């Protein structure tokens, strides 16, 4: 889940 959020940043 966190990976997706980081990719968005």
Curated annotation (Swiss-Prot):
GO cellular component annotations of the record: extracellular region
Q: Which domain of life is it from?
A: Eukaryota
**Tissue expression, per UniProt?**
Expressed by the venom gland.
UniProt keyword Secreted present: yes
Places the protein is found: Secreted
Alphabetically list the UniProt keywords. Secreted, Toxin
Q: Which family does it belong to?
A: Belongs to the cationic peptide 04 (cupiennin) family. 08 subfamily.
The protein's name is: Short cationic peptide-4f
Species per Swiss-Prot/TrEMBL record? Cupiennius salei (American wandering spider)
Q: What is the lineage of its organism?
A: Eukaryota, Metazoa, Ecdysozoa, Arthropoda, Chelicerata
């Amino acid at each position: 889940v966190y990976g997706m959020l980081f990719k968005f940043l």
